[in-house]
Regions:
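Catalytic phosphate/metal-binding cores of nucleic-acid and nucleotide-processing enzymes, i.e., regions
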Residues: 1-132
Length: 132
């Protein structure tokens, strides 16, 4: 039997604490996404952030439509200091694909902040390392 996770204390002062999201084997990346988005949205250095959906579908007329682009981070946004933010969310054992690593490198090379996050602790650590 798994031990129950307790609510984590606030990582960012007076903001609402990010909570560890219990993970199951069915959708570990979805649980990570919820946890990471909450941590980003509650961080005082983040002006805004949104999930980037990507994929494809076939319309009623049979036309194949793609949206998003290959390698784009799962979450994009902007820091309050104006820098672009890109976060690739991964499950505990997930690995970056080469095009995802290239996208994050491009963001960092242009002066933005780009990183991989698996949980709220990763968000806190990465943002602390790039904020004065």
């Amino acid at each position: 039997m798994r031990a129950k996770h307790q609510e984590q204390p606030s990582l960012f002062g007076d903001t609402e604490p990010a909570q560890h999201v219990p993970r199951t084997n069915e959708r570990p990346e979805a649980a990570a996404m919820m946890e990471v988005l909450r941590a980003l949205r509650n961080h005082p250095a983040v002006a805004w952030c949104e999930r980037q959906n990507s994929g494809a579908f076939r319309t009623e007329t049979g036309q194949f439509v793609r949206f998003g682009w290959k390698g784009c981070a799962d979450v994009i946004g902007q820091l309050r200091d104006g820098r672009f933010l890109a976060v690739e969310v991964k499950a505990p054992n997930g690995r970056l694909r080469p095009e995802q690593a290239a996208f994050l490198d491009q963001v960092r090379g242009a002066g933005g902040v780009g990183f991989v996050a698996r949980n709220c602790a990763d968000v806190a650590r990465e943002l602390a390392s790039c904020i004065n």
